[in-house]
Structure formats: C-alpha cells, structure tokens
Amino acid sequence: MSASVLDITDLKVSFDTPDGVVEAVKGVSFSIAPGECLGVVGESGSGKSQTFLAALGLLPHNGRAAGAVRFLGQDILGASPRILNSLRGHKVSFVFQDPLTALTPHLRIETQMMETLIQHLKMDKPAARARCVEWLERVRIPEAARRLRQYPHELSGGMRQRVMIAMAMMTDPSLLIADEPTTALDATVQAQVLDLMEDLRRDTNTAVALITHDMGVIARMAQRVVVMRRGEIVEQGPVGALFHEPKHDYTRMLLESVPRISSSRLGAERAPPQD
C-alpha cells in the first residue's frame, strides 16, 4: 500500500499554440501524505493549477502531459476516461475559487448535491437527500433542509462556498484539491471557511492540496509547502522551516510581500515581479 495519497514525479505539461509549443510545467515532483495539507504557492501563471489539472486528465485538447502520477499507488497519468471519471468527484474532489460559477445557476442545491451521491455512491434519493442535509449542517449552514431547496443565487458567497465544500467532502474523498478557495470572499468569511476546511481535514484525515498565491493562507493551513515559479518548483519543505529560513530569492520575495502590522510600509514594492 502506498504511503502517499498522491505522488507526482517529473511531471511536464505543454500546450500546442499557433505560435508553437508552450511549456507550462517543467518537470515537477512532490507527494501528499494522508491527512496532510500541502500548500502549493506561486503567482498567476506559475503552473500550480495546471499541475493538478494534468494529473487528473483535465487538460484542454491542446494540452499534453508526461511523467508519472500515482494516486493511492495506481498510475493514473493517461488512464482511461472511465477510470478518471470514477475518481473525480469521488475519491478526488475539488473546491474552486468562485462557487457561483462552479454551481449550476438554474438547478437547486439539492439536485446538484444529490447527483454526486447517486452517481458515485449509488444512493437512492431519500438516502442521498439525508446525507446532503447532514453535510450542510456539518459545514455549519443553518436551516439545512430549507437551503437545499434554494438556488445558488439565493445564498451568500460564503454560504455557496460552504455548499461546495460539503459537495467535495460528502463522498469521503482521499484527496481534496482546493484551488484559491477563499480568494473571492471577504476577510471575515475567508477566515471562517479556512477554519472549516482545517476542522474537516483533521476529522476525516483527508489529504488537501491547497493552491494559492497567499503565503498567509499557507502559514495558517499547510504543513508543507511547494513554491512554484515559471513552471518549476524553486523550493519545497516544511512550512516552519521555509518561512524562517527560505533558501530561494523568489520565496523570500513572496514572504516579504505579505503585509505585517509591525511594518512601517506594507512592502508592495517588494512583490514578486510578474512574468
């Protein structure tokens, strides 16, 4: 049995474009252990999201991936659509940045939640609905049964993201991939959602890949961190060691761009340069 939930080795991702081949990810390697939160941090265009999309067969038609990806010991890079579909939304779940676009606007919350349970866990409708209510309560949504009958636009942004977390966790996944899960939320709601995700990770022993540009979120949530720039990993290691003794200039710039109350200037001029 594999000691890691996810093992990525020398993964390369490229895209065919009218101007030639663009290399988005250039041979990255890392792993995620059961119950661990791995932070993957870098500016926009660093390749962090493309790494996970490639690993799970979600690249667009012009994308290509090479290397090795093992999920629970099984090689899944290039696996058949049937195998990948059985994993996605079941053993591997996603939480995206904007829940309003991730949810289907013309379908009630219960329809969208129950579909996952009926398809992947083969539940009947009464059992699926009961599990939906249970998970909405677990993510601290009041009046859960009533909320199930509502449409996405009738919920606040924070409540919609809680629905997405419930949908992601209710199939008992081994891996949760959270791609900028709180960027679209205000600071107070962001803190509540991060606390919720941390509580669920501890309660369920689910591995979490937390993709973000925010080193403050990494410090709050992750045990280990991978720093990406221009499609490459420039540094990785335990969060405490990396924050206290960063080895790479880019990591230091990311850390220095985080506002500190004690700073006389917020350090925006030290933010990492955009490519």
Region spans (language model):
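A short, surface-exposed alpha-helical micro-motif characterized by mixed small hydrophobic
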Residues: 218-220
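Conserved ABC transporter NBD signature motif
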Residues: 64-75
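Helical segment within the ABC ATPase nucleotide-binding domain
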Residues: 191-205, 216
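Short catalytic/signature loops enriched in Gly
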Residues: 3-4, 21, 142-148, 236-275
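A short, proline-enriched helix->beta-strand linker immediately N-terminal to the Walker B motif
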Residues: 170-174
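Conserved ABC ATPase "signature" region
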Residues: 74-75, 127-146, 255-256
